[in-house]
């Protein structure tokens, strides 16, 4: 996505003005200044732009706070990992959250956990964390491993996202190395319709239910029968 504005700019003729503002959150007041830059494209009124910014931020903070509810259950939980633009868009993710709920499972999202907690657990990663998204996903990974809050992990990836190719592989490797929690990587672009997506999701759900029903089962394979 980083190169998309330049690709469009130099490959499509007679374009209107592109909104190509760099968002840098390192400095405290940068976001407001950057939103002013965007706002001036539409209206030359600083007061209205600032009011719109604060209103939008208040709505965003409110919606985000609703996600950070305390966990009621520590069973039947599945975490869905991936970029917010995939997890929040029910068209892109093929309504996966509703499908999990219908199957009797609770879904968790990385946004439900406090940033301070994820920062603490992200430090357990031995390598260098390059992006905030990487920090969020690897922090969620280590937090879930220690707290044992979930029975399954689903990572929704977009084929065109280069960051996903690094983050998803790192998360999967750490999960498989440190625990036996089932992990499934679903690349949403691989499925032209819901058929293939649903088949993989249903198989994953069935496997979770089978594990729970048979967690105390010990196979008799290899035992001898003695008769007299």
Regions found by a protein language model. Give the residues of each.
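An N-terminal assembly and electron-transfer interface module characteristic of large anaerobic redox
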Residues: 1-228
């Amino acid at each position: 996505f980083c190169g998309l504005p330049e690709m469009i700019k130099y490959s499509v003729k007679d374009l209107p003005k592109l909104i190509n503002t760099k968002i840098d959150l390192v400095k405290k007041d940068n976001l407001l200044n950057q939103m002013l830059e965007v706002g001036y494209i539409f209206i030359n009124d600083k007061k209205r732009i600032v009011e719109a910014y604060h209103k939008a931020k208040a709505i965003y903070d409110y919606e985000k706070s609703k996600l950070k509810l305390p966990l009621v259950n520590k069973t039947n939980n599945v975490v869905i990992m991936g970029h917010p633009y995939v997890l929040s868009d029910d068209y892109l993710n093929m309504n996966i959250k509703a499908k999990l709920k219908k199957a009797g499972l609770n879904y968790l999202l990385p946004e439900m956990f406090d940033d301070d907690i994820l920062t603490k657990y992200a430090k357990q990663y031995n390598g260098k964390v390059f992006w905030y998204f990487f920090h969020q996903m690897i922090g969620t990974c280590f937090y879930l491993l220690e707290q044992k809050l979930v029975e399954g992990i689903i990572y929704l990836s977009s084929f065109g996202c280069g960051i996903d190719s690094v983050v998803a592989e790192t998360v999967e490797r750490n999960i498989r190395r440190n625990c036996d929690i089932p992990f499934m990587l679903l690349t949403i672009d691989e499925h032209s319709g819901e058929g293939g997506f649903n088949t993989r999701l249903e198989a994953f759900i069935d496997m979770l239910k089978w594990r729970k029903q048979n967690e105390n089962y010990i196979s008799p394979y290899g035992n001898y029968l003695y008769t007299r």
